[in-house]
């Protein structure tokens, strides 16, 4: 056994504590923007504290965790780090609102082999922006610098969100019935799903991600941040009896809509009620992807589907439009017979 001639430090092993401290200083102002009145204490404690809002009589906590998937690979390769933080919050908070829950707080996990303070700052500022859009507080997180675990400039992200809903107002799909209307809320693009297939299409088509598509680079279409629907849907819930909501993520229409439907109901989706955004047509054509596979993998322009009584469609659409959403009637709920699929796309 030999002894080093010079003393070793943590930095010699690849972990730079000073870089971590610099990151914390860089993000303080962004994190402060997300603060809610229920948050107790400041960033940096061993545990983050948050009271329950006093307006809830019988509060139920709703939690969710998610990542950004291989969308990160494109963001890293093309050095576009600003939006993946928004994606991270969106994937978690949009899942919470499906139950009717108001997001309260968010925590992030950022892991890398060597901490690049500038990149990490851009990512966390994006997370803070996503929290502002969702109305939740960024109350903590973990930055893990792990030499030997990640190659080059690679990093990974995970997010954790907790929300609250009144027990009597939980939305679980049990009220869905034959004759309900289905309203679609437009997506901003592929959001954060299907990127392994997207990257495969780029590979086999040998397409240049910088090429123009409908007035902007293809890569910008692909990396457009995930739309956050929380505030507009909370407004909708205040005024309408919503029976169910489905966040269209991995698995597309076929997998996500049935998650909120009773066994005896099916969703009838009218494909002529909207036009796919150009990026989905590009993917379908350049990847020779079937329509079935498109609907099973991507949101195809629909980020959220809402089920509610048919006589409330006009007022719901008016409200959602006023809140800045592009929303439309996409279909209806019908009786399901026997072994029929729970999603029918006409």
Curated annotation (Swiss-Prot):
Name assigned to this protein: Phosphoribosylformylglycinamidine cyclo-ligase
NCBIfam families in the record: purM
Gene Ontology BP, a term: 'de novo' IMP biosynthetic process
Pathway involvement of the protein, from the record: Purine metabolism; IMP biosynthesis via de novo pathway; 5-amino-1-(5-phospho-D-ribosyl)imidazole from N(2)-formyl-N(1)-(5-phospho-D-ribosyl)glycinamide: step 2/2
UniProt GO cellular component terms: cytosol
Family per similarity comment: Belongs to the AIR synthase family.
Enzyme superclass (EC): ligase
Organism listed in the record: Shewanella pealeana (strain ATCC 700345 / ANG-SQ1)
Keywords: ATP-binding, Cytoplasm, Ligase, Nucleotide-binding, Purine biosynthesis
SUPFAM superfamilies for this protein: PurM C-terminal domain-like, PurM N-terminal domain-like
Catalytic reactions on record: 2-formamido-N(1)-(5-O-phospho-beta-D-ribosyl)acetamidine + ATP = 5-amino-1-(5-phospho-beta-D-ribosyl)imidazole + ADP + phosphate + H(+)
Molecular-function GO term, any one: phosphoribosylformylglycinamidine cyclo-ligase activity
Keyword Cytoplasm: yes
Subcellular location per the Swiss-Prot or TrEMBL entry: Cytoplasm
Keyword Cytoplasm: yes
EC number: 6.3.3.1
């Amino acid at each position: 056994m030999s002894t080093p001639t010079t003393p070793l430090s943590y930095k010699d092993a690849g972990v730079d504590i000073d870089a971590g401290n610099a990151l914390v200083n860089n993000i303080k102002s962004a994190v402060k923007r997300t603060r809610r009145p229920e948050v107790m204490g400041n960033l940096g404690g061993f545990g983050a504290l948050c009271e329950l809002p006093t307006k809830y009589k019988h509060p139920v906590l709703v939690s969710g965790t998610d990542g950004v998937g291989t969308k990160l690979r494109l963001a890293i390769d093309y050095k576009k780090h600003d939006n993946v933080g928004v994606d991270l919050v969106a994937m978690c908070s949009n899942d919470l609102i499906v139950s009717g829950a108001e997001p309260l707080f968010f925590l992030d996990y950022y892991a890398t082999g060597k901490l690049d303070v500038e990149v990490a700052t851009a990512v966390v500022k994006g997370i803070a922006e996503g929290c502002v859009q969702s109305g939740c507080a960024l109350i903590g997180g973990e930055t893990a610098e792990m030499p030997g675990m990640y190659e080059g400039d690679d990093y990974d992200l995970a997010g954790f969100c907790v929300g609250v809903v009144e027990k009597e107002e939980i939305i679980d799909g049990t009220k869905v019935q034959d004759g309900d209307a289905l309203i679609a809320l437009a997506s901003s693009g592929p959001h954060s799903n299907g990127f392994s297939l997207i990257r495969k299409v780029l590979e086999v088509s040998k397409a240049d991600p910088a090429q123009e598509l409908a007035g902007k680079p293809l890569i910008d279409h692909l990396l457009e941040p995930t739309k956050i629907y929380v505030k507009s849907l909370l407004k909708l819930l205040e005024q309408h009896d919503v029976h169910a909501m489905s966040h269209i993520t991995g698995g597309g229409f076929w997998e996500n809509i049935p998650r909120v439907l009773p066994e005896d109901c099916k969703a009838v989706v009218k494909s002529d009620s909207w036009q796919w955004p150009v990026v989905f047509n590009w993917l379908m054509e350049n990847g020779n992807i079937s329509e079935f596979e498109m609907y099973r993998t991507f949101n195809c322009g629909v980020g959220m589907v809402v089920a509610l009584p048919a006589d409330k469609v006009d007022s719901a659409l008016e409200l959602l439009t006023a809140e800045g959403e592009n929303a439309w009637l996409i279909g209806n709920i019908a009786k399901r017979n026997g072994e029929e699929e729970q999603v029918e796309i006409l």
